[in-house]
C-alpha cells in the first residue's frame, strides 16, 4: 500500500507498465480507521475516483487533499466485504497493510463509499480479479483501456513471461514474485493430464466360412431355433453366446399296425 505515488502532475492516475484499468467509478469517498498514529494525509474523508487494475486498487483524490493518491495491492488487503446498509450508500470495507517504502507504516481499516452507486459491481469484480491474480491468471479484459480520456494513462501490456518490471523512475518496488506467480506449466507434473485413448482396433473382419449351401426350409427353421436360444450380453454387444450343438434326434419310425403284428 503506497501513498501519493500513483498520480501525475496533470491529475491522472499512474499504473504499472504491465497493467491497465479494468474498471473505475467516480464520486467515491475513502476513510480510514484503526490506526495507532494517524498521519495527516489519512485524516478526514477523501473524495475522488477509484480504479481497479489486474493487481491493485488505486484511489485518486480530487482537489488539493494531502492524500492525492492511494494504492492498495491485493496481497496486502484482507477481510474485504461489500456492505449494503438500509440507510446510506453501499460501501466496501477491509484492512490494508503498509508495504515497505510506501510512505506510511502499520495497517488500517479502510472504507470505500460509492455515493453514486457501483459498490456491488466494483466489489465483485475486485474479488474475482484478486482471486485470479493469486492463481497467476490474467483477468479478462486486462488490457482493455490503453488511454483514459480524463488525462490518466497506462503503460504497454505485459511481457511474454507474465511478470512486470517497473518502469524507469517507478517509485516503489514490485511485489514479491510468490504473490503473483506466472501461469503454471502445462506438463505431466500437473496431475490432470488424461491418458491417451486405447488404440483403435480397426473394423471387424467377417468370419471365414465355407461355401454356402442352398437354403432349405428345414435349415432356416433350425437356424431360427438356434437364434432363439442364443444369449445376448448388453455389456459385450459384439459377442453372442450360442448353446453347444446337440446331436440330431433319432429318426422317426411310425408304430406298426397291430394287425400286422
Curated annotation (Swiss-Prot):
Main location: cytoplasm
Result of changing residue 200 to A: Abolishes interaction with NEDD4
Subunit structure: Binds to the WW domain of YAP1, WWP1 and WWP2. Interacts with NEDD4. Interacts with ESR1 and UBE3A.
PTM annotation: Phosphorylated in repsonse to EGF as well as estrogen and progesterone hormones. Tyr-192 and Tyr-231 are phosphorylated by YES and SRC inducing nuclear translocation.
The name this protein goes by in its record: WW domain-binding protein 2
Annotated tissue distribution: Expressed in the ear and the eye. Isoform 1 is expressed in brain, inner ear and organ of Corti. Isoform 2 is only detected in brain.
Domain GRAM: 1-84
Protein source organism: Mus musculus (Mouse)
Residue numbers covered by motif PPxY motif 2: 248-252
InterPro entries: GRAM, WBP2-like
